[in-house]
Amino acid sequence: MPLLEGYGMTETCGPVCVSLPENNRIGTIGMPMSGVTAGIADDGELCVRGHLVCRGYHNHPDVTAEQIVDGWLHTGDLGDIDEDGFISITGRKKDLIITAGGKNVSPGLLEAAVMTSPVVNQCLVIGDRKPFVAALVTLDLADANAWLKSQGAQEESDLASLARNPIVHTEVERAVNQANEGVSRAESIRKFEILPDEFTQDNGMLTASLKTRRAQIVAHHRELIDTVIYVPKKK
């Protein structure tokens, strides 16, 4: 069954970009619809304007002034427009990581690439104001054990044991290296840690819509991040 991507927001009263059966490119959201213009701001944010963009936010003129500038709606999404006009979404602006070296890194693409591994459940890329990019990885007990069995290896009884398993570590490393092939060296994951637990709603690491709560995860694993991943330099 053919599946085609599109893009829209509440603020655009429906879709602003669509992929057509006769004109599409895998990995993109297609081209702007008739009457819609799209552009990429200096910070990488996708902006759109046209008759579909709402007039503003009811009773919130301050938000309207911030989000809609000279008719351009700032979507909050990071994106690219290729030479043929096809648009790709690369992440969320609020999730953007800026390393200590000033490199802007969109974590979403890296995270998605790492999570293609059959053993990985979740991945959180970190590195804001840090010297390099790193990742926190969680495992799926059932899927990881199924993969171990397919490799002729012994299954593990819990996530903590899985996290210490050298075969699993090698598989996660493979996934990280593969993810790094799609980005520059400055954007690549230099270190990763496999966690002995998962991000869940119960432990406050996921929202009700199952999105990762980045700030909470970083705060919870602060000691690991500051003493293991980013080892302080000896004075």
Predicted segments, located by residue:
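C-terminal module of multi-pass small-molecule transporters
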Residues: G108-A112, V125, N177
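Ser/Thr-glycine-rich phosphate-binding loops at phosphate-binding pockets of nucleotides
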Residues: M9-T12, T75, T99-A100, T207
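C-terminal boundary motif of the adenylate-forming
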Residues: L78, S117-D143
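Conserved ATP-binding/catalytic segment of the ANL
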Residues: P32-T99, T116
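Conserved C-terminal "lid"/linker of ANL adenylate-forming enzymes
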Residues: Q122-L124, P131, E173-K235
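Gly/Ser/Thr-rich phosphate-binding loop
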Residues: M1-N24, T37, N121
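Adenylate-forming
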Residues: E5-T12, H51, V53, H58, I68, F86-M115, A135, A144-P166, ...
